[in-house]
Amino acid sequence: VSMEKTIRIGVDIGGTFTDFVLHDEVRGLTRTGKRLTTPEAPSRAIVEGVERLLAETNSRAEQIHSIVHGTTLVTNTVLERTGAKVGLVCTEGFRDVLEMGREIRYDPDDLAQQPAPVIVPRARRWGVRGRIRADGAEHEPLDESALAATVRMLVDEHGVEALAVAFMNSYRNPAHELRARQIISELYPDLLVTLSSEVAPEIREYDRTSTACLNAYVQPLMHGYLDRLGADLARLGFAGDLRIMLSGGGVTTIEEAKAFPIRLIESGPAAGAMAAAHIAQAAGEAKVISFDMGGTTAKMCLVENGAPHVKHDFEAGRVHRFKQGSGLPLKVTVVDMIEIGAGGGSIAAVDALGLMKVGPRSAGSVPGPVAYARGGTEPTVTDADLYLGYLNPDYFLGGEMALALDDVRAAIATRLAGGLGIETNDAARGIQEIVNESMAAATRMHMAEKGKDPRSYTLLAFGGAGPVHAYGLAKLLKVRRIMVPPGAGVISAFGFLVAAPEVDDARGYVGQLHTLDWDHVNQLYAGMEARARDVLLRAGGRPEDIVMRWSADLRYLGQGFEVPVDLPPGPLSANHREAVRAAFLQTYAERFDRVFEDMPIEAINWRLTASLPVTPVSLAHHPTGGTPERGHRTIHFPGFGDVSTAVIDRYALKPGDRVAGPAVFEERESSFAAGPDCVVTVDRDFNLVAEIGADAATAAAPRRALAEAT
């Protein structure tokens, strides 16, 4: 076997399953895999899954060029409050900024509401004298002796494991923070230090301080995890690059991940959006709703012209998971998506009012849904899907895991139907209707906020449960077109292989367009580009392959929040003022449906995204031949009732095949059920494309079309 490094592996650690995709560029081989997540030791599932994929493809660990993975470790650490003991050194007088926050109520109707608990208690927050003005000039020198005494006290008396340094206006001039790190390193060389001017060099001291503290909070844990994972993989013989997915959809090096682990807060979900963007672009779909439904949550985001929407702020560790404002603010680039507690493992129960409620509690992988026969007793969405015919009890994970249909029937009858006084069939249908309506309502609101109409989009469904629920969701959204990629159940792991190595950076510099110092703006970009180039070259890139994209956060003077606007390639000058203004007005009109022609426009932050190209990967399979139709089973479709449905072996289909619904398409990791009003076509990339409401007479009947195809 050649020892040339030709294999890339993507790994997605989810709440229920860990998904894998292996791609060998020379052999043109792509193989997927799925294992139950091991929450007590996340790296174990990774190592076991990689070992299995290598064995199945007759490969060696020495052939692996890179392993890219996303992790929920940062998110879980913040949610569970299991991070390091952190100390904060700030400007004197700003010790309590974390508790003061924005001084707003996230729920005006809840008189007993509690803010998200701060992760750095007051005893570990201390201010020191020294001040930088808003224009970057030094107003008062840093009190270095007081700083040293404060750090000694925090480490020796309070036992802090990591420090955050956040001085006022450091985004404009980081000199005091840089000097502080020098002093701390001389005192405690091994202490991990986060500077707010490096992790979030933008205005708004509360958000910047919160980001720095949360970065310090998760840093020791991520250092340990990444070191352990690297050692475990090295024992397999792996000597390639280990890379991590960023929350914004790019891929970064282990060194960057260790320095700024907070940028991995949405690492896992971003991969699904990147996979959706890659698939949509290859298929020529300009407007797509990415719908990723796994075992724990459902995530939706918009993908337009081959790129997912992104935003530059995020809220972590919410007291109420789905209430905006109840968490801790972060200045990080993330894929702009909505997430609701509606996954295959979401538990259905009768609440105190005698009504059925689904989620956000999830059965996860342990004990899992009742169908898994691993000790679960509470019925879940997956159990309802099995009961209603959407899943094949003998072909879950390609037959690796038999599903316990009798146990599911009994659990729904005793836990739900009995308490509600309804038939078991109605209870199962109720679970599915509730979860579909929850996802539809969240998607409608997300799109309405952006002035978008779902009817003009294609629903791209993936995740283990996404294709199962795609038809029901599409009907509620009045979407007419559904696309289901091959390997849909592991498509998030595929996203790691098609995401580009990337650096996102920003600098705060506030000024009105007509008075901006454009030379200073160009200096900011020169610094950001130099740093980005260094990171990407260390990641193995070539200088000529690096693509730089500039953007800025602009607003009308006096507004509290801004909108991102793409900038022309630099260097910039006063001659670009009108082009920047026009771009802002267009973006503002698209979002708010109005503009104010005479109001001054103000720039807040200047952003850079630098990336390398990525080698295209396809999950297309080679048709197995034989007859695709496996028989029939009864499936309940909303609006049609129980319908005898053709069962199709997806692996036997080839491009150009057409199937009139109702039909359920089975593959190892997921199933797609197309209703009676669908016509499904297999495109050149082996995507299933379902047209809802298409004229079924124009499509061949399943038996005839598929018989002729073979």
Residue ranges of predicted features:
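Conserved phosphate-binding loops in N-terminal lobes of ATP-dependent enzymes
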Residues: 10-13, 17-21, 29-45, 50-51, ...
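Short beta-strand-loop/turn "lid" adjacent to the catalytic site in phosphate-handling enzymes
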Residues: 31-34, 61-104, 164-177, 200-214, ...
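Conserved phosphate-binding/catalytic loops in two-lobed NTP-binding clefts
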Residues: 186-211, 478-494
